[in-house]
Amino acid sequence: MADKKPAADNWPVVSGDYIVGDPESPVAVTTLASHNEDIPAAAGAAIAGPCKTENLGIEKVVANIISNPNIRFLILCGAEVQGHITGQSIQALHENGCDPEKKKITGATGAIPFVENIPMEGVERFQQQVELVDLIDNEDGGAITAKVKECIEKDPGAFEEDAMVIEVKEGDDDEDEGEEIRPISAETALLEARIRNIDTQVKLVGAVQRNMAGNYSGKVQGIMIGLIFTLVIGFLLLMAPLLGA
């Protein structure tokens, strides 16, 4: 049997919308924008729940994972969160970490991918402790259940270090720390992305129209020059007999 260690007192240490199972299970599951957390929980996950924002949401996931050294796998499943792109942001944090000063997740494509409440040692612990399993955009209950059970069978045992507890501040208690980064809803972020896309398309159409207008002007000029040239040649041909006489 794999070696186990105690999780932090009162684990999970951060509140959230999740189902808690056996704290000695090696598997944590985030269902991203989907609400089918009952499936991985029933399959034996230690904790399972949605994660909809690429800042506070990810901070909570990381805090609850590193405070339980028994968790060695994090399965990302369910629908990706539009606008926030939370699943990809978690992958980027695990692979690339974050800027040590700005705390922006390196390589994340979400709207506001900042993990200000996670110290660098917490980020490194997250990277070292768990293996990510990518089932993003997969809501199939059978596939999720099978993957949870597969990870349980591969349990390497508890992480070598004890539980790490960090505080995740949900309020804005430190206004002097700098400009607050306010989470936005997935719908708002998606709307902004679509507006930017429309603006780009409008600019592209304008460029095409200008190009077509330039081509049209060039064609008109060519026709006029050809017409004038034809008239001049015709005039000279008509005048040739008279000049010869």
From Swiss-Prot:
Its cofactor is 5-hydroxybenzimidazolylcob(I)amide. Residues 244-245 are extracellular. It is an enzyme of class 7 (translocase). It comes from the Archaea. 5-hydroxybenzimidazolylcob(I)amide binds at residue 84. It holds the Pfam family MtrA. InterPro entries: MeTrfase_MtrA/MtxA, MtrA. It catalyses: 5-methyl-5,6,7,8-tetrahydromethanopterin + coenzyme M + 2 Na(+)(in) = 5,6,7,8-tetrahydromethanopterin + methyl-coenzyme M + 2 Na(+)(out). Keywords: Cell membrane, Cobalt, Membrane, Methanogenesis, Methyltransferase, One-carbon metabolism, Transferase, Translocase, Transmembrane, Transmembrane helix. GO terms for biological process: methanogenesis, from carbon dioxide; methylation; one-carbon metabolic process. It is found in: Cell membrane. GO terms for cellular component: plasma membrane. Binds 1 5-hydroxybenzimidazolylcobamide group. GO terms for molecular function: cobalt ion binding; tetrahydromethanopterin S-methyltransferase activity. Residues 1-222 are cytoplasmic. The complex is composed of 8 subunits; MtrA, MtrB, MtrC, MtrD, MtrE, MtrF, MtrG and MtrH. Part of a complex that catalyzes the formation of methyl-coenzyme M and tetrahydromethanopterin from coenzyme M and methyl-tetrahydromethanopterin. This is an energy-conserving, sodium-ion translocating step. Belongs to the MtrA family. This is Tetrahydromethanopterin S-methyltransferase subunit A 1. It comes from Methanobrevibacter ruminantium (strain ATCC 35063 / DSM 1093 / JCM 13430 / OCM 146 / M1). The gene is mtrA1.
